[in-house]
Regions:
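Small/aliphatic-rich secondary-structure junction motif
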Residues: 18-76, 99, 103-106, 156
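Short, solvent-exposed amphipathic alpha-helices that sit
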Residues: 45, 83-94, 118
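CheY-like receiver
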Residues: 49, 118-122, 126
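Glycine-rich, Arg-bearing micro-motifs that act as flexible, cationic patches
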Residues: 130-156, 170-174
């Protein structure tokens, strides 16, 4: 029996698609936040990335859904009207700041239990070349519990993730006894 007739590794079938090449200066950038306003450092990093190619920027705000009640969706765990309004104002302010710099900007709002999964879905579906997110300084135990958004996004998609470190505003010294 010839080698080609055997069932095994070398079956006929459709070829796998070649991975798409991501341009070095990105032409489409996703600027994302999870339930908080954009910090100036994050906007500066997005502007630095977008400037060489005058990239198109999409500003995405993710509202956090906090879980289920007895396995059923509970309206009290969904983002309320005030949270939506605060998130929309923050996203619009960031978009206006980028438009003042001359960039073409689109705005998106979404809600999700798993924000990193939603950001990765947006990046894949709309073919972005770079993702910029804030990486606030947190203790290690909190990173383990809450997860690291930048690492989770990078694990879910092949688009480069630029995590901008944000220093903590709290004083984390030990309290006097």
């Amino acid at each position: 029996m010839p080698d080609t007739a055997r069932r095994g590794r070398f079956r006929r079938g459709a070829a796998t698609a070649a991975p798409r090449r991501i341009p070095d200066p990105p032409r489409r950038i996703l600027l994302a936040t999870v339930a908080q306003p954009f910090r100036p450092e994050v906007l500066t990093r997005a502007i630095d990335l977008a400037t060489p190619e005058h990239a198109k920027i999409t500003v995405l705000g993710i509202a956090k859904v906090y879980g289920t009640s007895l396995g059923l969706p509970n309206p009290g765990l969904q983002p309320n009207r005030i949270e939506w309004q605060t998130l929309k104002e923050g996203v619009d302010a960031a978009a206006d700041a980028l438009r003042m710099r001359g960039f073409e900007v689109r705005v998106g709002l979404s809600r999700s239990r798993n924000a990193s999964k939603m950001i990765a879905k947006w990046a894949k579906a709309r073919n972005f070349h770079a993702i910029v997110v804030a990486d606030p300084e947190r203790p290690r135990w909190r990173r383990v519990i809450e997860g690291d958004v930048a690492h989770e996004i990078g694990r879910r998609c092949v688009v480069p993730v630029f995590a901008v470190p944000i220093p903590s505003t709290s004083d984390r010294r030990a309290r006097p006894a």
